[in-house]
Amino acid sequence: MCIRDSLIPPFRLPTDTKWGYQTIHKDGNLPKVERLMNEEMVLPFLEDVEWDLHPGAIASYGDWPVETREEFAYAANARLINIREACQSDKYNGIILLGGGEPGFLEARELCRNFKIVCTANAHSQMYLATMLGNKFSVIDISGVHNVYYRDLIYQHQLN
């Protein structure tokens, strides 16, 4: 069986954003390898996998990365539409949600389950991997709002 995954970011910022140095803002028409963040670290793990990189929906709340719960909700809503389209295309047997805050992850898992497609997200996977390495782990983020959001994700994933 061929593994075919779709990597779906939570959002995409306009190419002219002043926040481009730290987040997804590349032109959606570029080849997927050029749009993949941290490609030098990620590509070796995708060698035996057929994969697509969705360009992500343009952020509806502004031209900056998500900062508030409201903005996480907008990102989740936009991404769920892309996830449904990927599931309905019948091309994928895995959906990987990019972005640490994993907006819409629980909803995406529910949606993907209906199509018998595996779905995972960065924070969920990273936190569970961290528990395999030791008894404690830390999440470091520069935003106070994000710190509380990640704490809630830790509780949600029952890792407290």
Residue ranges and their predicted role:
Residues 4-73, 142-160:
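N-terminal glycine-rich anion-binding loop in soluble enzyme alpha/beta folds
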Residues 4-5, 134-137:
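Nucleotide donor/acceptor-binding cores
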Residues 73-91:
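Short, well-structured alpha-helical segments in soluble
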Residues 92-99:
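Periplasmic-binding protein-like
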Residues 109-133:
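Short, acidic/small-residue loops that bind anionic groups at enzyme active sites
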